[in-house]
Amino acid sequence: EVTPIYGAVGFESRYVDFLSPKWMEMLNYTSSTAAKLGMGMDMNTGTGWPFGGPQIKTADAATKLIVQTYKLNAGEIVKEAIRVNDPKQQGIAVLQALVAYDEKGNATDLMSKVDAAGNLNMQPVTSKTEVYAAFSGKTLQKVKRAAPGGEGFTLDHLSKSATDAYLARFT
């Protein structure tokens, strides 16, 4: 099995970037030598853990749920714009759901009341209410112990487009 991982310290001048022409030449040599010896050969399509790399852009990177809660008393509204608080997620995370729950557990979907700037056009609540904002954010995790040339974001393993983007470099 050929599994490309991080390079050995002290041998940086001998690193060969993953899937570069030189790397492919070396893989070809390994494969043909194995065949001559009557051996099979397998190659892992990952470098390090988990799968990802330079071809994975932010849109296809591993995703996570971010939940923010706004607690309101009777007569109040959410005054601030509904935006993700984490500075690392600003400009990345996308609001997916906005739901208010009153004291009795009744739910009200507020998504249609949020404008493009995140301003919420709502009436004051009549009882204690909790508003939950659910954002689709990114883990921003990078491939750990990536082979030279394999560094980059971890892919969203549940996304067809991310998987297609990842596998495209092998076709």
Where are these regions (language model features)?
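Aromatic-lined carbohydrate-binding/catalytic grooves of carbohydrate-active enzymes
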Residues: 1-24
